[in-house]
Amino acid sequence: MIDKAEGLVLRTVVYGESNKIITLLTREYGKLAVMARGAKKPGSRFNAASQPFVRAIYVYPRSRGLGQLKSADVITGYSKIRQDVFLMAYAMYLLELADKALDERVPQPALYDLFVDGLEAMDEGLDPDVVSFIVELRLLRHLGIAPHLNGCTVCGSVEAPFAFSLNHGGLLCRRHRQEDEHAVSLTESVAKMLYVFSVYDFSRIGTVDVKPETKRLLRQIMDAYMERYSGLRLRSKRVLDQLLNLGDD
């Protein structure tokens, strides 16, 4: 039986002299790998469709093992991202996040849409930090380890101001702020921003102008939370951080 799936290339591995094993995140079948024979050869019909964060329609025989790619029609390669080394680094981080966090052959169309929509938003000019925050928070929610952002984790109060507590896994109100001496104080607008990023999809975000100091604070919070609760250690994240540090010098 032949399967046909819309997919996003998460990573590729060279196999032999001219072949590639492509790991795809597909809408229909979840994460899976296929063999693209001859993909490394100049002029190969699979060359374009086997590049990271290319989205295409892939046709291959159904198999419990490694299927052999029969055809691929590229939908988009996100050309604007490819022209910017910083955007490339953000995109590679999102791809590795999907690759490491998602199980194989478990269809999850909502998460497929999340990563595709994130790349499209970045390609269309949305701040890549905002894209990353949204993807991270939505993915954490799917994994069942999202921070509590719609009120105090202790009493449920929705009255600002709040602080973010890594130990409590979310917000603390003024009354319970003292329960974590390391909690990070947030303005009302920043606390609301975190909540919005966790529940809105990209079509509802629109144009967002986030101050550099706010992005640094949110990144500090998200990095610490991801490290504590997700258990993911991503090489692409270290590369991205190094690149951003160079850009700040």
From Swiss-Prot:
Pfam families: RecO_C, RecO_N. GO terms for cellular component: bacterial nucleoid. Disulfide bonds: none annotated. One of its GO terms (biological process) is DNA recombination. The keyword DNA damage applies. Keywords: DNA damage, DNA recombination, DNA repair. Involved in DNA repair and RecF pathway recombination. Belongs to the RecO family. HAMAP family: RecO (MF_00201). This is DNA repair protein RecO. It comes from Exiguobacterium sibiricum (strain DSM 17290 / CCUG 55495 / CIP 109462 / JCM 13490 / 255-15).
